[in-house]
Amino acid sequence: MLERKSQAAYDFNLYLSVQIVATILSFVLTTWYIICIDKLTFKIAKHALTIKSQSRELLVEKRLSEKLLFQMLPRNIATALKETGEVTAECFQEVTILFSDIVNFTEMGSRSTPMQIIDLLNDLYGLFDDHIEKYDVYKVETIGDAYMVASGVPVLNGNAHASHICNLALDLQQLMKEYRVPGSFQRKEQVKIRIGIHSGPCVAGIVGRKMPRYCLFGDTVNTASRMESTGQGGRIHLSSDTYKLIKQTGIFTTVLRGVVTVKFSLAAVVTVGDSNYARLTG
């Protein structure tokens, strides 16, 4: 009888010990599991915040890249390039191209520091950029003191391209009458520009991969450049082709300059003005 009671007490104590150990083990494992889950949740939340922050930074970088792309290329061309990865070169039957440069720029550069020249070009072309936004034109490029603008490309605008370019040219020449060099210049430099304009066909397309540029090619570009280089300071020099287009509008005053040799050929050229500006003489 005593042996049975002793065995029963032993069994009960063993059962109780097992239950206590199981309870403690369960508590420890549950606590460990909760701690692990909590740490894992914290890591996931932290990772999610990192991803969110990186996504935000990526979005900002994407917008900056798009902004830079739209500054380098016409908007419709940049959009097509972004969507398809390539843009086919196009032929344009008639566009108008403007070239301008600073008269005696080389001489001015010889008596100025490089920083002064950079200040001058940044200041001057910043003003030009503000003015071209008023017209249906596209700034193709600036190389040194040369400034190139086109109208009728890449967006067609009928026969209005010549008028837009001529109005811009008049606006720029009027701007130069009031222009003062930046404060970095110790002496007052008189800055004049000469402008050359020509109308005709051209081919336009994207050139380059790392730094893509929208470039124009053809004799029209070359002739417009010659119009500028054979022009006079403070005047707007345009070819007879452009003259024929703006003559139809009846709003411009032109003066025949005569026959000028342009790229080994003869071309009739005129200077231009309108009723809002002082008449220009040839």
Report residues per predicted region.
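Catalytic/regulatory signature loops of cyclic-dinucleotide turnover enzymes
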Residues: 180, 198-199, 219-240
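Hydrophobic transmembrane alpha-helices
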Residues: 1-16
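Beta-sheet entry/capping signal
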Residues: 97, 138, 192-194, 234-236, ...
